[in-house]
Amino acid sequence: MALEYPEELKYLDSHEYLRVEGDTVVVGVTSYAVDQLGDIVFVSLPEEGDRINRGDSFGSIESVKAVEELYAPLSGTVLSVNTVAVEDPALIGSDPYGDGWLIKVRLADPADELGETMTAEEYRERVEG
Amino acid sequence: MVARSLGLMSDLKRTPLCAQHLQLGARLVPFGGWEMPLQYSTLTREHRAVRTAVGLFDISHMGKYTLSGPDVLAQIQRLVPSDLARLQPGQAQYTVLLNEQAGIIDDLIFYCRSPEHWVVIVNGATNDKDRRWLAEHLQGVHFDDLTGTHTLLALQGPAAVETLQPLVDIDLARLGRFEHAQVSLAGKPAFLARTGYTGEDGFEIMSLEPEGIALWQSLTAAGVPPCGLGARDTLRLEAAMHLYGQDMDESTTPLEASLGWVIDWDKPDYFGREILLAQKAQGTERRLVGLTVEGRQIARHGYGLFDGEQQVGVVTSGTLTPTVDRPIALAYVGKPFAPIGSRLEVDIRGRRAMATVVKRPFYRRAL
């Protein structure tokens, strides 16, 4: 399977991606992560209004093979949670950058916090060596 | 997520089919000292192929021996709780090697070619241990280790007979479950057994390396999907077949592991017999049971089982399976919680989910 890393996104070395839309950020997992996990069967996510802190676990994603923690790439408040993906976790595998997004976060400090992200090209080099 | 380390692949053994696996796009992972295919397409697709049609596994990492000599039967009888003297040539028995404490050294299959000639197939991860145990306890038996020279393929699924029939010189319909034969396969000698580890009909085929590679190539070229360890694990777990080292080991006896059916109580002495007789009389403190778990989260190896605040068991294998489509698990639980219908809670990373003891297997093929 050819893995894709859309140019307009920012990437974390823990395999989350960020789609920045003004002072809000959509967080999901990359197609590389999905490929590594295999069939995704469960995802646990925070509630709307929860505060998340950069570096902390904000949930977990589970496949038949393994469970992986999800780490918050930034600090902020959870604006919305993709309940459709919670109901149907296979969506994360089939469309990680679209309908399979996880949470939308309002940045605590829009000027900060996005320093350690990678571009699509940097991320591709990292995961594909 | 965190990047997962897959270990040092360079130290791992490879089966003769490794080049085929890479060519088919397999993801390789370390397994019991071997670099083995985890999956080629997706676990679910491979699992369903075996349940609905047919799939092909490379299981060449498994230990393969022949034992021969006039005194073989009497000697191997001392090592297992099953009565191997009941087997006719062409029949096989799944059983366990026991130590003096009735602990399970391995689970394995003895194939009777004749009372003087046996084929033995053991787990890959325990191969060295088994070989040492056999060498230590068998005298005057000619022991031949075929592991390095022979491949072992498993063709599993309801379409296994029709898939394999054109290649062999015997009528496969006449080979019963757990029966085996020396056959000519595409013109070359092969050992063919109607055994497997998926809960489906199927065959395990042992042959020399070049013939094994040729068979793999011809079956995959004909459209038989190759299947990896991922599907093998979900298939065997649905069929409630134990994985050695996970669901049982030397600290468990066959009665605790719910493998009482392999024990012949009337057979002559063997390692661990007195302990098994005592356990039979008194019952075991714990035993392996099947569980279904509510929700969608998987109860995995090592997760605790609770009755209120008291831990009463531990999960040994768990998955969410494509056929049953709910979380299932095998677990050791204390005697009071072993009956069918017992309700327990499993601790899934800090959250509790209800689990119910159910009849095994979770899946049984239509006959």
Swiss-Prot record, chain A:
Note accompanying the cofactor annotation: Binds 1 lipoyl cofactor covalently.
The cross-references to CDD domains, in alphabetical order and at most eight, read: GCS_H
Query: Which keywords belong to this entry?
Result: Lipoyl
Kindly list the cofactors needed: (R)-lipoate
Q: Where is the Lipoyl-binding domain?
A: 24-106
Describe its function.
The glycine cleavage system catalyzes the degradation of glycine. The H protein shuttles the methylamine group of glycine from the P protein to the T protein.
Assembly information from the UniProt record? The glycine cleavage system is composed of four proteins: P, T, L and H.
This chain's protein is named Glycine cleavage system H protein
**Gene name of this polypeptide:** gcvH
